[in-house]
Amino acid sequence: RSAWTGQQRFGTVLWSGDIEASWETLRKQIAAGLHFSASGLPFWTVDIGAFFVKNGNLWFWKGHYDAGTEDLGYRELFVRWYQWASFRYSAGMEQTAEENFGILKIQKSLFMMFLYK
């Protein structure tokens, strides 16, 4: 989540940290990745899809999709996030257990839906 001057020589992998699911957050993640790369830190990754529900007091659990994977808006955001992240050398998904179950449940049909349109 953090870096310092000279870290480039160690070839470390950086991650943007826990984030909320919103189009604004995705936009900021793209800019953050460009900034990291421009500063000589190309090994940077992101959590695909982010946290989509308002579930607790943690600052990153402020997603805009309380219906989760049933929300067509979140499905669109998730696919666009995945498309962008596929150009990264490394990317993963980090959600709560409740969110992961929903994503795994719809992931195949979601990708097939967008793949053949």
Predicted regions and their residues:
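Catalytic-domain carbohydrate-binding cleft regions of carbohydrate-active enzymes
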Residues: 1-117
